Amino acid sequence: MRRGLIMLAPALVAGISFASTRYARAEDVKLPATLTFTAYDTGTAGFNIAVGVGKMMKDKYGTDVRVLPAGNDVARLAPLRAKRAASAAMGSGTYFAQEGVFEFGSKEWGPQPLQILLSTVDCNCGSLGVAADAGVKDLKDLKGKRVGFVVGSPALNQNSLAVLAFAGLTQKDVKVVEFASYGAMWKGLINNDTDAAFGTTITGPAKEAETSPRGLIWPPLPAKDKDGWARMQKVGSFFFPQAATCGAGITPDKPIELGNYPYPIFVAYASQPADQVYAITKAMIVNYDAYKDSAPGAGGLAADRQTKNLVVPVHPGAVKALKEAGQWSDAQDAHNNKLIKRQEVLGAAWAEYGKSNPPSDDKAFLDGWMKARAAALAKADMPNGFED
């Protein structure tokens, strides 16, 4: 591990708050002496990018950044919610957490008002990687095959279902194999416990799988297949077509048409101080050159490469930093305000549902919440997004 970057077990992180009274200064950025980020498992793209950003903060500001790996979305957000981390490097789970669906529809969670600092879209994509010895050429060939799911990670599982939907397949058409974490799922592919796993093309585990005896392929998602993309976006609205030019088994001269969305997405809670979020975001923007080559995918964090008008709002502190970089518009501001209003509607609906004496049974509780959620969004004339 590079100097200044410490990977901690959850038990050790429990005693560390991102709030600090001792600050390190450089230019007009003020960072605490210690910061904690959460990310996907060790070796993943999200983890490696967080490490690269952390090294920059150590080199430029003397800030020690601790990157805490976590195997699912719930584990990534728990330290952030408890104010023991400053940011989480998330994926599409950001959206599911905001919406209060899947695991985030449980009594312990509900809608989470997450807001974005910066996100990255680079030369990589995200899709189902398939063992080369599984007899799969196209996605439709996954029918009857084993597909890895991660317990407690609705994002990864929904992403897998979205890719399957491209080929007209559903969960019933494959054999779901559950794993405890993202890393365990990819180990399962290497060890012949599953045939397919969702991930980014640049994730470390995918590269391990490619060099393993099983090998790895990425079945294509051609952009010209409009029906396939319509099916896929119905399940994962945040996906868009993109040609991957980097990753396991992929080069610029051998691109593969796949799908993508911003990953990682560095998020904070709406309640986190704007000046703190501003400082972190500003540091990432002005020192971009110091970490852009630190890990595959890090280059996409540039201020002028930010995906505009995502389904989750940008934090006011990050908005300030983006405005100063000349990368924010009135149209984005209007869109952002609508998303913040959506989070307020969802939060109010959750509070009201909690007062309605909801069922104690977990499934009945979730079913009741989804109905209350749908009613609140309809009343506010906002799209549901999870009708099916």
Question: Whereabouts are the PLM-identified features?
Answer:
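Bacterial N-terminal signal peptides
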Residues: 7-17
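Pocket-flanking alpha-helical
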Residues: 49-56, 66-108, 136, 183-188, ...
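An extracytoplasmic/periplasmic, membrane-proximal ligand-sensing/linker region
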Residues: 32, 201-214, 218, 275-277, ...
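Immediate post-signal peptide segment of exported/extracytoplasmic ligand-binding proteins
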Residues: 21-37, 135-146, 329-332, 383-387
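Ligand-binding clefts/hinges and TM-proximal coupling segments of bilobed small-molecule sensing domains
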Residues: 145-162, 238-301, 310
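Pocket-lining segment of extracytoplasmic ligand-binding domains
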Residues: 92-94, 103-104, 124, 134, ...
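N-terminal export leaders
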Residues: 1-7
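Bilobed "Venus flytrap"/periplasmic-binding protein-like clamshell domains
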Residues: 32-60, 65-66, 124-191, 202, ...
